[in-house]
Amino acid sequence: RSHCTHCKKQISLINLIPLIGFIKQRGKCKNCDEPISLMYPFNELLHLVVGIHVIYFFGISLMSIIIYTIFFVLYVLFILDLKHFYLPIGLNIFLGVLGITTNSIFDVFINDIDILNLGSASLSILGYSAGFLSLWTVNFIYRLITKKDGIGGGDFILFAGLGSIAGPLALAPILFLGSLSALLIVITNLKKYSNEVPLGSGLILGFIFYVLLKYFELLVNIVVI
């Protein structure tokens, strides 16, 4: 069961309740008074807010479960890459499978795109393939010149997964927004990211910004995406 990372004492069930446990303990372990990281209540609050908004827009439905699952997977990948420069292949592949399956069954994420009269399922597969090959090609050219990799393999599969969800036409704006986001992440901690960039975390932020801009029609009079 969960325990305090400082004194190793087990946490009571009532104190494991999201947000309530943190408030009840006043932000400290009840056994050793070690401050509890603010990341815990932040994570809990973030997922609560996202869950409420998903249900508000899509109701209590299978679609809500799928959308929240996509968010949860992206959140885990974001944190892992940000802290450890690690993007598990299993989660990345699951994201791609989820994107292709959802677009094939529900026709929801990329139903406004018309390329050669392709259906959502075909566009999802095309987005997956284009996402993978685009970053793979960039890294291949970089490797020919420098004799070393410039982009991690996990980033290829992650970008492919994002393409399977949003479609091939979304890849360019996601990459642009993701690159800017990755740059901002590096600027916030130059010491940690001096030799390696969490591109995956940046791409995930770029995807989220893209979704907000497109589906909530932000900047609709300025850009068309």
Segment roles from a protein language model:
Residues 1-225:
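A membrane-topology feature that recognizes alpha-helical transmembrane segments
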